[in-house]
Design a protein with these regions (language model features):
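Positively charged, structured surface patches that bind polyanionic biopolymers
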Residues: 1-79, 90-130
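Minor-groove-contacting beta-hairpin "wing" of winged helix-turn-helix DNA-binding domains
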Residues: 82-87
């Protein structure tokens, strides 16, 4: 099972302190730390699974997903494929290791949302260009 580090500065972020509801905060932590979140920064899980794991009801989850996507711009949600893309995941969870990049590329075959795959591929390209 992967180890996920959370930057403790998250708890000092004024947006989280002032604007996130308790459900937004909890769901955000769940998305960041779930074993269902791939190395590429995409969580793949139906709402029923998220509800089971978090003990939030589906309406609470949908409300928080909407907040995290539209209000706070932390994620993108693809309802059809049950996938959540964490925006800027790479800033906190990737290194410039070529082995890591190769592992991330392998995880993309599990992602159905083409928009999410393209986002991650663009991010990988930027990382490769930084290493040159």
């Amino acid at each position: 099972m992967p180890n996920r580090n959370i930057n403790t500065d998250m708890w000092l972020d004024s947006e989280i302190i002032d604007d996130f509801s308790k459900n937004d905060t909890f769901l955000w932590l769940y998305i960041l730390t779930s074993p269902k979140t791939f190395l590429c920064g995409v969580l793949k899980a139906p709402l029923s699974s998220i509800a089971f794991d978090t003990k939030l009801n589906k309406n609470e989850i949908i409300e928080s997903i909407n907040n995290l996507e539209s209000k706070f711009h932390k994620i993108k949600y693809n309802k059809e494929n049950d996938e959540i893309l964490i925006l800027n995941w790479h800033k906190y969870n990737w290194t410039k290791s070529s082995k890591l990049i190769e592992s991330i590329e392998r995880t993309l075959k599990n992602i159905k949302s083409q928009e999410f795959v393209e986002y991650v591929e663009r991010t990988i390209d930027r990382y490769r260009n930084l290493n040159r």
